[in-house]
Amino acid sequence: MAFELPKLPYPANALEPHIDEATMNIHHGKHHNTYVTKLNAALEGHSALAEKSIEALVSDLDAVPENIRTAVRNNGGGHANHTLFWQILSPNGGGAPTGELADAINAEFGSFDQFKEKFADAAANRFGSGWAWLVVNDGKLEITSTPNQDTPLMEGKTPILGLDVWEHAYYLNYQNRRPDYISAFWNVVNWDEVAKRYNEAK
């Protein structure tokens, strides 16, 4: 079964002014769609791999034949990362986490503000293209970043919050001001979705 581009869970203009409609249309409809198209092309003739979930596929790249492994890593990673990204954003987002996730963030990072600072540092200091992540690793929260379209799933970690810092994610609106984009991100984080993923992963 071929992988498919998921629909956005909100209109393309719903995250404005923090993430603009033009960026969303290009980012989702062009960039993410291209990852899906190229992933399906790479997996032609490999039906057993194509039937896996995207998470299972990128979690076990050693099972992917060497001649298509790079294509699956890049495009499968891009599909997995963006599928999560759209879900953890919301026009009704922002604020702060509550419940067990809030307790875990405070225990691991000292406070929500300290967590945001460390996460923003990971995003701002990721050289070139990549992602910043909040992951669950052996039941504990960690902040990490990955290059290109690599996903923490490739390292056995479960991402629950991700920020795309490829220039295509922000350049139309923010140009070279990546820190401004990172600051705007906090206004649209869907903490209910992040908490759900935390509870499933811990």
Swiss-Prot record:
Record GO cellular component, one term? cytoplasm
Its Enzyme Commission number(s) read 1.15.1.1
Reactions accelerated catalytically: 2 superoxide + 2 H(+) = H2O2 + O2
Source taxon at top rank: Bacteria
Binding annotation for Mn(2+) = 27, 82, 164, 168
The cysteines covalently paired via disulfide bonds are none
- Modified sites of kind Phosphothreonine: 34, 70
Instruction: Explain how, and how many, cofactor molecules are bound.
Output: Binds 1 Mn(2+) ion per subunit.
Alphabetical UniProt keywords: Manganese, Metal-binding, Oxidoreductase, Phosphoprotein
Single GO MF annotation: metal ion binding
The cofactor named in the record is:
Mn(2+)
Q: Name one Pfam family in it.
A: Sod_Fe_C
Family as reported in the entry's similarity comment: Belongs to the iron/manganese superoxide dismutase family.
Assembly and interactions? Homodimer.
Q: What does this protein do?
A: Destroys superoxide anion radicals which are normally produced within the cells and which are toxic to biological systems.
Q: What is this protein called?
A: Superoxide dismutase [Mn]
Q: Name its species.
A: Halalkalibacterium halodurans (strain ATCC BAA-125 / DSM 18197 / FERM 7344 / JCM 9153 / C-125) (Bacillus halodurans)
Q: Which gene encodes it?
A: sodA
